[in-house]
Design a protein with these regions (language model features):
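Class I S-adenosyl-L-methionine
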Residues: 1-208, 212-221, 235-237
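TPR/TPR-like alpha-solenoid repeats
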Residues: 230-233
């Protein structure tokens, strides 16, 4: 019987995935590197090693490519901040670019549309997910009450610049990392939709393998028949 679960990898144990029905949540204590299941995935690998402040990050940079590999293997979605270098490192298409060799494609969204306190611009990478389903269910709009990062008032005054969210509060690191419940539910729904697509791909791959084996068997059978005929001493013409 095919599982109806999806796996959420590299997630916060206090976040929304841990309590969601049908979600197998893998936080740091479970070590998402060990996931070898066939269920589609939602992946949130650490962004520090691939962001603008990567030289200060102590996160494991190998988790990003591993998360990409999982999405390409079983289907689903990967979430990372806008401009993440992980996209270049793993040759994922940026939003607006053609799909890659895995059928993967990307979309830019803002998590404020699902209830985050800040805009939190995000890039999503999909494999096995129908773009029509995504565009039919994606949200836009929303007004932030906080800003993820902004310079101090002294820096703004010294440089004579106008900061877009100067009147907003700065988010704490906890608020910044938080995934809105509605956003998580949307990603889970999209990842679940990849199950049939990825199953069809596997079936086609298996069918191709069977055909290759069948052709080889035919050739081997012909060779065996010819050898048997020669051994039987068929009269020469």
């Amino acid at each position: 019987v095919m599982s109806e679960k999806i796996a959420a990898l590299f997630v916060d144990p206090r976040g929304p995935y841990a309590k969601m029905h049908g979600v197998d949540a893998w936080d740091e204590s479970r070590d998402a590197r060990l996931y070898v299941g066939a269920d589609p995935v939602v992946t949130h690998p650490p962004c520090g090693p691939y962001g603008s402040l990567r030289k200060f990050s102590h996160d494991d940079a190998s988790l990003g490519p591993l998360a990409v590999e999982q999405v390409r293997r079983v289907g689903g979605v990967l979430e990372h901040p806008r401009g993440s270098r992980l996209f270049a490192v793993c040759k994922m298409p940026r939003p607006g670019e053609p799909p890659d060799a895995f059928g993967g494609w990307s979309l830019a969204v803002e998590q404020v549309s699902w209830g985050h306190v800040a805009r939190k611009p995000t890039w999503l990478y999909f494999v096995g997910v129908d773009p029509m389903l995504v565009t039919a269910t994606v949200r836009t709009g929303g007004e932030p009450t906080h800003c993820i990062s902004r310079p101090s008032a002294a820096v703004v005054a010294a440089r004579g610049i106008t900061w877009p969210c100067a009147t907003l509060k700065a988010t704490s690191s906890t608020l910044n990392r938080r995934t809105p419940q509605a956003f998580a539910e949307w990603l889970v729904m999209l990842a679940s939709s990849a199950r049939a697509t990825m199953a069809a791909r596997r079936a086609l791959a298996e069918l191709d393998a069977v055909h290759e084996d069948y052709d080889l068997c035919d050739l081997q059978e012909c060779v065996a028949d010819a050898a048997a005929t020669l051994r039987a001493g068929v009269p020469r013409a």
